[in-house]
Amino acid sequence: METKKTLREGYTTGSCAAAATKAALTALITGQVQTDATIRLPIGRVVTFSLASCSFEGETATAAVVKDGGDDPDATHGALIVSTVSWASSPGVHIDGGEGVGRVTKPGLPVPVGEAAINPVPRQMIREAVNEVLAQYGLHRGVKVVISVPGGEEIAKKTLNPRLGIMGGISILGTRGIVVPFSTAAYRASIVQALQVAKANGCRHVVITTGGRSEKYAMQEYPHLPEEAFIEMGDFVGFTLKQCKRLGIKMVSMVGMMGKFSKVAQGVMMVHSKSAPVDFGFLAALAEQAGASSALVAAVRGANTAAQVGDMMQEAGCTKFFELLCEACCRAALNEVGGGLTVATSIYTMNGQRLGKAVQIDGDDETDRRGS
């Protein structure tokens, strides 16, 4: 029997930055090139990082660590995280971002506008690394730390940073110090952050989508909304709706396709392909309610995919089916959060044709079958 492979954990950009900082400061103090650095992660684990480089000249030292994302490589996997350390004229640890580290331009993030996108936990890890080395050598001096990521501006284009208003590079992130492979917690955290930015920038109406293609169609449907109002929720429909309500967002538009929204209509709020199968009996009942012929209802019941059902109903000109499906999605969403929101649902084909739309405002249904 084949044994299941254990996925290898990686380390966050914050952990890499802290390790590089410790090595650079040690080199600055001792005048010796370092080959590795050992730090304690926020979860309590002690880890030794090998250095990609270490050098010093005069009152400055630099060390670098290659980011290893483990078996869940993200856009920053393989990036060089560089720390340049020098003595500061004032006491304390002064942290800033250099080349390839983004700068915050919009409110709603854990870091104030104008500062380098180095999140609070990595900042604390860097401070702890500096203080540990200073204590080891009995020194009481101010230290300046600049974190940089060569090529970080290009890497950032593959992340949510431009949407979040983090310009010029990547963020230095991490709350636990490790990257758990395919962690749902990381994706949920990105949803919350995107919603917080939307709210902080005055968005009272957000559009949540199941993926990049759905988001493209959503932007065409709601061209008047700013970019930060559009949030990819992936499979986390229920979680995203609850976060919208928690943050006081009043209008939520859901945009997606037949496969996932056929599940949402039944109250399935985690719509991964493995989480719940499409219920073709439910879709057949909707088709019957929409006035489909008995032969078409039977065909729906025996279909292989929800997209196939959509094609069948579209070819038959049964637009009422899509109205009913969108209405069911709105009701399920409101039921999930206990009301208090206005919810719209739009369902699209893979090619970007809108099949139907419904809006539920405090218990009232409005339906718009076609067009924009």
Curated annotation (Swiss-Prot):
Domain of life, per the record?
Answer: Bacteria
Give the metabolic or biological pathway.
Cofactor biosynthesis; adenosylcobalamin biosynthesis; cob(II)yrinate a,c-diamide from sirohydrochlorin (anaerobic route): step 6/10
Supply the name of the protein.
Cobalt-precorrin-5B C(1)-methyltransferase
Protein family per UniProt:
Belongs to the CbiD family.
Give an example GO molecular function: cobalt-precorrin-5B C1-methyltransferase activity
Record's keyword terms, sorted: Cobalamin biosynthesis, Methyltransferase, S-adenosyl-L-methionine, Transferase
Query: What is catalysed by this protein?
Result: Co-precorrin-5B + S-adenosyl-L-methionine = Co-precorrin-6A + S-adenosyl-L-homocysteine
Task: List the PANTHER family.
Answer: COBALT-PRECORRIN-5B C(1)-METHYLTRANSFERASE
**Could you tell me which Gene3D superfamilies the record lists for this protein?**
CbiD-like
Q: Name its GO BP terms in alphabetical order.
A: anaerobic cobalamin biosynthetic process; methylation
- EC? 2.1.1.195
* Chain segments annotated as transmembrane: none
